Amino acid sequence: MNITAIRNEQNQQPLIQLKNINVVFAQKTALQDINLNIYPNSIITIVGPNGGGKSTLLKTLLKLQTPTSGEVIYSKNVRIGYVPQKIHLDHSLPITVERFLSLKKGIKTQEISTALEQLSISHLRKNNMQKLSGGEMQRVLLARAILNKPNLLVLDEPTQGVDITGQAELYQLIHQTQQKLNCAVLMVSHDLHIVMADSKEVLCINQHICCAGTPDVLSNDPTFMRLWGNQIAQNVGFYTHHHNHHHTLHGDVCGCNSSAVHCQNKDK
């Protein structure tokens, strides 16, 4: 299946174009015929099963992985801010948040102060990175990503290990950051269905793009509002998959049908 994403409703030039991207490792296909345009101010969420190629797609986009075939085209003015899933710190070498952020080349003290203030973590400035909570670490990594004032923010599974309330708070923070920077957002999610409500498009990837669509707005559901409250309902969306095929446990396409099917997690 070959689905081209994302729709361009304002005749903008894309920040990044992925054209017919294929990545093969030792005869094993990781990505097949991926076509993706990332436009200014768009918010894109990528979901899919473990081992489905989400990380390979990000690495290809970030120039960390050379595609076997296909082309990645970058606009002249693209500036990427990257938030990794996690970082590994040596506990025998303590480093403060301020010192960690200052390691980014050419960054001034005032720029660090602005980023910390923007994410409401100025109080963490002198704290050791090794002692931060998971949520605090995510905010610090986000602060580092926005230091160069990116017009594309790339986040790798930022809500992994975070409960639904924490996810809503993080999605709200990402939305506020996107609005302040006037940037595009490309986010990978470990959850197949729970996504950021502001996503303009959700792509399901399992080697290829299986389906694409928009999340359901949960704030329109009075039952959900009563159960979870306004903050979660406003920031969390639910994505319904619409596949016309399904995959084996090894990821191979093994048939087509007209009904929507669920993604299979190949690690199970």
Curated annotation (Swiss-Prot):
Annotated SUPFAM superfamilies: P-loop containing nucleoside triphosphate hydrolases
A single GO molecular function term of this UniProt record: ABC-type zinc transporter activity
Recorded GO CC terms: ATP-binding cassette (ABC) transporter complex
Membrane-topology descriptor: Peripheral membrane protein
SMART domains per the UniProt record, alphabetical: AAA
Domain of life: Bacteria
UniProt subcellular location: Cell inner membrane
Function: Part of the ABC transporter complex ZnuABC involved in zinc import. Responsible for energy coupling to the transport system.
Subunit structure and binding partners: The complex is composed of two ATP-binding proteins (ZnuC), two transmembrane proteins (ZnuB) and a solute-binding protein (ZnuA).
Name of this protein: Zinc import ATP-binding protein ZnuC
Species in which this protein is naturally found: Haemophilus influenzae (strain ATCC 51907 / DSM 11121 / KW20 / Rd)
